[in-house]
Structures are given as structure tokens and as C-alpha cells.
Amino acid sequence: MMVSLWIVSLIKKDASIVDIFWGLGFVMVGWAAWKISDADSQRGTVLAVLTTLWGVRLGGYLWWRNHGKGEDFRYQAMRKHYGSKFALKSLFIVFGLQGALMWVVSLPVQLGQMTNNAKIGVVGVIGIVVWATGFLFESVGDIASHSVLHGTLKSRCHPSF
């Protein structure tokens, strides 16, 4: 997936697409692990669905925030620094690194898919509550960040944004 995104970034001359696909990559990993595990379990399905909700929310937000704004300043700086070597460097430094990080960060989802016929249980319910809390905090944080940077709170001083 990351190599395909890298090729698209070369065509578009915009490495920022890697950010938009960060969350969606987890969706792909979650469902691939679900399919590969061949485990028909409640837990596996719930993990894949929750990963999908989180990944689509994150990818959608990043698309909405960045769409039409051109390449992110970080990648522009890399492009300027590496010059003609940027294409190959971006494969490893940007796309390869994010692919490796995605694999590591998604290990709990991948490992959670490995048990056949796993029921949700009390620990699973606690996990769903923790997930929902995190999902809510991320969503509210994104809305607050946007309000501070572009909306009603733009004139207030919020150094963390």
C-alpha cells in the first residue's frame, strides 16, 4: 500500500497524501488481519469495526483539513533539502517509515485477531469503553483545534495549537 501511495505522490508531486492515508492504512491492516486470521470471533469483528471507525474518522478529518492546500511544509522542506534525490528518499523516510510505524502501532489489532472464537467478555467491554472515550476525545480535540485556528476562537491565545 505504501509503495502505491508513494507512486501517486510522485505523480501528484505531493507527499502530503501519506498523512491522509495514515488512518485508512489501519483500516486496511485491521481487515487484512481479520481475513488472514480466519478467526470467526466477536472480538475480531469488533476490533476490525472499531479500527474502521477510527481510521475513517481520522482520514476524513485530515482530508477535510488539508484538501486543496498543497504539499505540507514539512515535505516541501524535505523536497528542497534533497533536491533531485527527494523521490527515492521520500520512499524510505516518509512512506517506508510510516508503513513500519503503522505495522507496529497496529500490532494490538493484529494480535487481537489471532484467537479463534474469542468472545467479547468483560475485558472486551472495558476495551470498547476506553476506545469510545479516546474516539470522543480525539473528535472533540479536532473540533477545538479547528475552532482555535480558523473559527470563533481564532483571536484567543492558545499556544498549544
Could you say what each language-model-derived stretch is?
Residues 1-159:
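Membrane-anchoring alpha-helices and their flanking helix-loop junctions
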